Regions:
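Extracytosolic ligand-binding ectodomains
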Residues: 2-437
């Protein structure tokens, strides 16, 4: 860790980035809030509350559990750093369960706001972010979502920051995975909400563009848009099986694939799909909502189905960083598993808010909002280096391709490759290349 003393009221603490003192002072001065002649800057003292809206229950609960551990780890680090510097304030994290439900998320945001909290990590799903957005904007509540990706929420000047690229980036990743596996007729199954609709659209457009660019014949078929509240999928699986059967009869199973866009309800969907042999004869591609879902590796029959259909789920890849390993270790020790990459974004979200608060030296969401993009630009944390675009979303990124696989007599998630956004190419892991020969 490198700590740079702050001139006047500014400090820039860059995790793991070794820079000279002179450079540090220059950077701090660049984004220091102005203090007029004779003015006395207000100072932070005592408890500084930060809220977190996490899906500790519902269809993103495994992610929520991971991110809670990551946030608690960040809270501990931040407070140790503040104490070592002799600061008179400390971070206090207030976690509420959003239940992966938009209405619950709004209710819990209002609860946190009622306690005077003006800074929030989460919620995770785009449907939740969409629901809370108006209230957050109206009340100057700064929200940092670690995983909301809907392009519909990329709005310049609002109070929502997202430390992940939108699905205008993820869509091409999923399209490339399906295309490179030989799929030319892609049937979509998706969660009918803000996130699912946006990702389905982005993937469809990217896949059709690939077909056009390469001169290949093919199509994207609107398969099943399901209710996000659904718990059982026998009817949806039957409809999907009928569509796939017709396409396989026309074009052959090697050219037909399924684009499955959902959260943990995909466990139940795949369980229903197993009743139709044709659905295990074509390739599947998932999304960031299924990457790392623990329920898909707990049951052997579900894991084997995923292996057979090569169920690769793209999820935004963290950059190389030694701090990633610290967070991963903390989650592994507490929960016995590796976290999804969004846990690293949660960790970085709390750190960057804390750094911005330290710079403005007051509990002022507007002051933090004004400098947060510059803090992020000079920050190097668990998810690596990144910048925010004009809408406050992560501006770029590659995607890891996660898949359930056989590990040590059981099953776990492994990374089969990385999709590189700049070149629209996939770098496959050697183990995966050998496994699918």
């Amino acid at each position: 860790m490198v700590v740079i003393s702050k001139p006047l009221v500014a400090v820039l603490f860059v995790i793991g980035l070794v820079i000279g003192v002179a450079v540090g002072y220059a950077v701090a001065a660049t984004i220091a809030p102005p203090v007029g002649p004779g003015a006395v800057a207000p100072t932070l003292k005592g408890e500084v509350p930060i809220g977190a809206l996490l899906p500790l229950t519902g269809v993103l609960s495994s992610y929520g559990e991971n991110d809670k551990v990551a946030l608690e780890f960040a809270e501990k680090e931040i407070n140790e750093w503040l104490k070592a510097r002799g600061e008179e304030w400390y971070i206090k994290l207030y976690v509420e369960d959003s239940a992966t439900d938009p209405k619950t998320a709004l209710d819990k945001l209002m609860t946190l706001h009622g306690k005077g909290i003006k800074f929030i990590i989460g919620p995770m799903s785009s449907a939740e972010v969409s629901e809370i957005k108006s209230y957050a904007d109206a009340n100057n509540i700064l929200v940092v979502s670690q995983s909301s990706t809907s392009p519909a929420l990329a709005i310049e000047g609002d109070w929502i920051f997202r430390y992940v690229p939108t699905d205008l980036v993820q869509g091409p990743a999923a399209a490339r995975v399906a295309y490179d596996q030989g799929v030319r007729y892609l049937v979509q199954v998706w969660r009918g909400d803000t996130w699912g609709d946006g990702l389905a659209r982005a993937t469809r457009e990217a896949f059709l563009n690939l077909l056009k660019k390469t001169g290949q014949t093919g199509d994207v078929i609107e398969g099943v848009r399901y209710d996000p509240a659904a718990k059982e999928f026998s009817a949806e699986a039957a409809k999907l099986a009928s569509l796939i059967t017709d396409l396989v009869n026309k074009y052959g199973k090697d050219k037909v694939g399924i684009d499955a866009i959902g959260f943990e309800e995909m466990i139940a969907f795949i369980a229903a799909a197993k009743a139709y042999p044709i659905l295990s004869e074509v390739k599947w591609v998932g999304s960031d909502g299924t990457a790392g879902v623990s329920g898909l590796v707990k049951e052997a029959d579900l894991a084997e189905f995923c292996i057979k259909v090569q169920f690769l789920s793209p999820i935004n890849a963290p950059g190389a960083s030694p701090h990633l390993e610290k967070v991963k270790k903390a989650v592994r020790e507490k929960l016995g598993r590796d976290p999804e990459p969004y846990a690293y974004n949660s960790y970085d979200g709390l750190w960057t808010i804390a750094l911005a608060l330290d710079m403005v030296d007051k509990y002022d969401s507007k002051a933090v909002k004004d400098i947060l993009p510059e803090v992020v630009k000079r920050y190097y944390g668990a998810s690596g280096y990144f910048e925010l675009d004009a809408a406050g979303d992560k501006a770029f990124g590659d995607y890891e391709l996660w898949i359930p696989w056989r590990v040590d007599g059981g099953y776990d998630w492994k990374i089969a490759g990385i999709w590189h956004g700049v070149t629209d190419t996939i770098e496959w892991a050697p183990w995966w290349t050998a496994a699918v020969k």
